[in-house]
Amino acid sequence: GNIVYSDGFYKNAYNAKKVGTEKGAGLRWTTQWQISRTVTADNTAAFNYSQNGGYEYEYVGSGIINYNDTCFYRRNTVRDALTVKWRARHFTLSSITSFQHITDNLTLDQDFLPLSYFTLTQAIHESSLTQDIVARGKAGFYTWLGGLFGFYKTTRMRAPVTLKDDGIATLITDRVNNNDKIPVMIGFDNPEIPLQSYFRMPTWGV
C-alpha cells in the first residue's frame, strides 16, 4: 500500500486557505491458489483514492490566487483481475478476467475570481469488464497461439455548469435592463441557474 499527502504551497487570498493540497492512498492485494496439479489461479485486487484541494490558478489581471467558490478533484479506482491457468499435456489454456470501476469529480470555480460568475462540475462513473482466453501450444518443433478477447465499458458523465448571481447580472439582467431599446425589465428569483448535461457512452467489442 501507499499513502500520499501534501498540504500545498500557495494560499487562496479569498479565504487564506492553502490550495494545491493532495492526499491519497492505495492498496493492492494478490492471492494465489494451487487448485490442483494442473490448475492454478491468481487474483489481484487494488484500490486507489486521491483528492486534490483547489488549484493554483490566478486571474491574469491581478496576478493573485483569489476565488470564492469550491475547487477540488477527487478520484476513486477499484480494479480486480483473475487469472486461471490449466496446463494440459500438449497446451496451456488461460482465462484472464478483469474489472475496473472509476469515479471522479472535477469541480471548478470557472471564473477564478472572488465573484460568483459560474462553476463547472464534471463527474464521471466508468465501469469496464474484459475477458481474455488464450490457448498456447507447448514448445516443440513448432508452437501455436490462439485466443479470444471481449470487453464492455460504460461511461456516465454529468457535467452541469451553474450560472451564479454575478454572472446572471453581468451576462443577462444588466444587458437587458440597461438597454433602452428593450421595453421590459427582467429579474430572476433564483440566484443560480443550473445548465444540466448528462451523457451515457457504452462501448463493447470482441
Question: Over which residues does each language-model region extend?
Answer:
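Face-selective signature of the C-terminal outer-membrane beta-barrel domain
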Residues: T40-A46, T77-D104, L120-V206
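Periplasmic-side early beta-strands and strand-to-turn transitions of outer-membrane beta-barrels
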Residues: G1-C71, R75, I102-S116, A123
